[in-house]
Amino acid sequence: MEKVVLIICLTASFFSAFPQNSPTERQLIESTIQNYFDGWATGDSTKVSKAMHASCHLKNYNNGKFIEFTKNQYIGLFKPHARPANLSTRIVSIDITNNMGSAKIEISTAKDLFTDYFNLMKTNEGWFIADKVSTRTPHKIFDVNAIRLEKETILEGLKRPWSIVFISEDEVLISEKEGDLVKVNLLNKEKTKIKGFPTDLEDSLGGFGDNTGKFEVLLDPDFKTNKFIYLSYAAKAATKGRTTKIIRAVLENQSLQQIKVLFVAEPHTHERVHYGGGMLFGNDGKLYFTIGERLFTEKDEPSIPIAQNIEDKRGKIYRINSDGTIPNDNPYFGDKATPGLYAIGIRAAQGLTLEINTSKIWFSEHGTHQGDEINVLKAGGNYGWPMKTTGKYRFAEFAPKPILGNTYTEPVWSWLQTVAPTGLHFYVGQEFAAWNHNLLVGGLSKGSLWRLTIENETIKSTEELFVNDRLRIRKVVQSPMGKLYILSDELNGKLIRVKNGAL
């Protein structure tokens, strides 16, 4: 009996030695709302009921008439049915204070857009919808031919901006590759430099051939509560050269405080290209980021190419927890693999984006001579570089020796011409309703903006926009209210709103 007790105690101690990742309050609220979405979409009254507190009341005002339902009256309206193919859902915003919260959600059907505002509360049993108000807006009928693209410059004077994130509809953070991290009020154009950036930042030498500087700025999913932001940049180390570094900081009083280093893509090298630096939070709450291979030409590849070497941090995509620890469910690449690996075979990926209706992550990849790609991120995927490319090698004599047993993930799209794709974004909104769930991709080479229509993981069509008004585009984003913006990569960089002049 003593042996049995000892084994149990040791087993319990073993498992307790590994930290268990608890869901955040935001993730718990998202789970509650997902129950509501799933029940609403399929008529499952049990799931709708699970999301709502017993005291929940539901209200709307329609055609001059006030309507109110109790929880039981509301769930009594649901009858089981198949999920409509053209139904989509999204959480627009969540705000949390202690055990209270509010959320705005949207449910889009073939004919209508339903917008609900939830008040939520946390009890001993979890988060519940305490009450909701709702409205219904019929979709306007749009045709691609009814779209008239227009540009409106909102902000200029940016020093090769690399990334933008919205704190609110009218306030943004912008990282300038050759300048500062700035907070900007889009209404009065007031620009404030964020102080406290790490002193190991390697400055750009200027010019299109130097990728060095500041890269992505990203808000924590719980930013309103914890004030965490994440930054990627080129960091220097004495005579060793430079590399990509990922940090987390608290944004307080226009300053970076409590800086924590999450990742350093060692080794440092003297090259000034292909840092990667794209970052994204997935729907799983994990931080994904890209690290470039850091070579300009293939002739400098070692015997085991950098992007194929699981012991080398370069040329990879990573998945980590927001505090820098490694998730237990990451793919296994081998005992010697660098921690946090999620995918390998990456050359110079910069853009990451989340497909809202599927939770898939898509990314853009730069080829060496043509070979620019769009990929879907797969756990454990090997995207082939430099063993294979859809383009050509810059060093024509390069012939990589095959690696026995390797299999490679094919891109979902590649261009015949050089595009240099950067920040990409799935559009969801009403201003360009015909573009819903289309992928918008900015390009640096020759200045381009692309619209790709998608079915599952297949590109069905492509359209190049603004062909007579080209601009080096670094980022495509939407504001919290759905306005579409592009960020231009110029010495006089601009934040430009893309508008539909037909409305």
Locate the predicted segments by residue:
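Conserved blade-ending motifs and adjacent loop-strand segments that build the rim/top face
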Residues: I346, T458-P480
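Beta-propeller fold detector
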Residues: D131, E152-L155, K191-T199, S255-V264, ...
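Beta-propeller domain segments
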Residues: D203-F208, T212-K214, K224, E293-E463, ...
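Short, low-complexity N-terminal intrinsically disordered segments enriched in polar/charged residues
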Residues: F18-S45, K50
